[in-house]
Amino acid sequence: MTAKKQGAQASASAPSGDSPAERAQWLREELERYSYQYYVLDAPTIPDADYDALFIELQALEAEHPELLTPDSPTQRVGGAPLSAFDSVRHRVPMLSLNNGFEDEDVINFDRRCAQGLGRATAAAPAAFATPAAPADDLFSAADAAEAAANTAGNAVEYACELKFDGLAMSLRYENGTLVQAATRGDGETGEDVTANVRTIKAIPLKLRGTAPSVLEVRGEVFMYRADFDKLNARQAESGEKTFVNPRNAAAGSLRQLDPRITAKRPLSFFAYGVGEMEGFDRPGTHSAMLDGFAKLGLPVCDERRVVRGAQGLLSFHREVGERRDQLPYDIDGVVYKVNAIAEQEQLGFVSRAPRFALAHKFPAQEMTTTVEDIEVQVGRTGAITPVARLAPVFVGGVTVTNATLHNEDEIRRKDVHIGDTVIVRRAGDVIPEVVAVVLERRPADARAFVMPTECPVCGSHVERLEGEAIARCTGGLICAAQRKQALLHFAQRRAMDIEGLGDKVVEQLVDLGIVRTPADLYKLGVAKLAALDRMADKSASNLVAAIEQSRETTMNRFIFALGIRHVGEATAKDLAKHFGKLDNLLAADEAALLEVNDVGPVVAQSIANFIAEPHNVEVIEQLRAAGVHWAETEPTARAPLPLAGKTFVLTGTLPTMSREDAKEKLEAAGAKVAGSVSKKTDYVVAGAEAGSKLEKAQTLGVAVLDEEGMLKLLAEVGAA
């Protein structure tokens, strides 16, 4: 560390005549204090040489007296022995992602939603935002007066604004003030235990200052300053090692080293920005106060933040940060807005695995031109055929891009992309590269138009594109290697063949090891083969074999649903089983016959017909029957008009005597369609206790509202009770 101002010699205030234990404790406290001044306050008070001398003295003392070594000693940051792998960590509070905004309108709509959710009126969005730009030496000095003028009514929502760091999200768990665990975000539910590596990051305190909660889980970002990144790459180049493409990749790669000693040599930093768990301490009333509290505990918190009111304050912050983005000492890809009051955050809650009270406002993506060398297709896990442009390498948005999504065939036609074209490539949201436009004046004479393949490049099955859909799909769902894992998981789910114990991890191993290729292969599995899988004991293997054996006896509608035919859900599977009675009747049906089935329209009929027409799918069905999968069959039933056919219902709230699933079954048995959201096409809303926004929307649209008794009365009136 380089001192900004020289202090007295570090040892001048050391106690004299102290014991080794007292001296070691004093050294630890001094080193942590100097680290706090350097990394948190950005105000070092001693030169590097003095710090190093204290550090070496403590190392020597602990080596001479091993009993004095403590887990939170600064000497423990140097890294221990290499790990064989990272353990998984289940986040007690999920690390959710944020919804993104890219345009000013997205921010205005976000503010409006927050205000409405909190029961506040919102002013009309301003036509322009004329807040003066901040002076070059002060990012936020120009905003306060403009914000006050824009929110004179005092009714606007208050937000905490922060930078969105381009690093790696991290969870730090402190118990009684001591760091006990660090984990990556992972998929939000489960991350990796990187405690040994995080302990080497000098910016992260091993012991919190002052009075800390009994449990505090801090959320933040591990990143690398640009200057540190440049120095690291220079060292890598000098030693003949591979250099990193950008600070984010360097930070992520450094943190995920199995050898903590390598991580210890990498200049990683950290900023705290949120909290997961907190026990033994009252939470502050606002997000901004919580960040202030973090700083008092010795956690690094970015100073580039502000509390504002309303959409204008948010947009002013975004604009000012954007103007200074290139001058900041670290990479950011946007700013983050959070409703400041914690009580209001709780009132707004969450939707679709993201908080309603927060928004990540991304900066405009960077764009570059390159050439399309080829257009290939990729097959997704659900069979979606996605065209991908293979590009001449181009450095854009901080990375070298060689591929870009073209989304679908219509998008290629709309943008008129040809093989050989010069195109503008953008990293949408600074993450996913995409082709934005073609530079037509540079089109070569030998440019070739893209032709969507008629056969799947993975399994050779027919490629279908249903009317009204933009995505083409492989029809070989049961045999296509690209779809194999998803097909098996769907086949085994509770509402299909109900094979308990056949989850993600088991399916992943069975497919990756080549043990299972189609659902029929499941019925060849024995205990020995399953027990050989990772984390699969003999008892678990025996239970899974028993569950597979039990699934041989099923119902025709469950079997049809388990096949994973596109657009065929549980209700349609029941209709097909009831209508045809025997599976062979279904397999022999053409589109005209399928259209005779209740609630089967042209799109569903075409999807079923395409599935049946694929020989590989019929072959797997026969293999399953040969493996002993069976069900009771009946005689076909003629289609009869159902009393509520054509009527759409929506269920909301808690019904007094039945579950919503039971109510749904009754309504569907009478021919009704049960939808998940209210629209002008909704005929009835059945509302129970604590009905929410669906009931409000129904009342706004004038949709008929029934309670459970009213629904049962209606069913009785039409003879469907």
From Swiss-Prot:
Source organism of the structure: Cupriavidus metallidurans (strain ATCC 43123 / DSM 2839 / NBRC 102507 / CH34)
- Family the entry assigns: Belongs to the NAD-dependent DNA ligase family. LigA subfamily.
Q: What class of enzyme is it?
A: ligase
Q: What does this protein do?
A: DNA ligase that catalyzes the formation of phosphodiester linkages between 5'-phosphoryl and 3'-hydroxyl groups in double-stranded DNA using NAD as a coenzyme and as the energy source for the reaction. It is essential for DNA replication and repair of damaged DNA.
InterPro entries on file: BRCT_dom (IPR001357), BRCT_dom_sf (IPR036420), DisA/LigA_HHH (IPR041663), DNA_ligase (IPR001679), DNA_ligase_AS (IPR018239), DNA_ligase_CS (IPR033136), DNAligase_adenylation (IPR013839), DNAligase_N (IPR013840)
Biased composition, class Low complexity, residue ranges: 1-19
Coiled coil stretches, renumbered: none
Q: Where does Zn(2+) bind?
A: C456, C459, C474, C480
User: GO CC terms for this protein?
Assistant: cytosol
> Quick one: which gene encodes this?
ligA
Keywords per UniProt = DNA damage, DNA repair, DNA replication, Ligase, Magnesium, Manganese, Metal-binding, NAD, Zinc
This entry's Gene Ontology molecular function terms read: DNA binding; DNA ligase (NAD+) activity; metal ion binding
Cofactor(s) it depends on: Mg(2+); Mn(2+)
- Ranges of residues in domain BRCT: 639-721
Q: Where is this region: Disordered?
A: 1-23
Q: What protein is this chain from?
A: DNA ligase
Q: What EC number(s) does this enzyme carry?
A: 6.5.1.2
Which residues of this protein are catalytic? K164
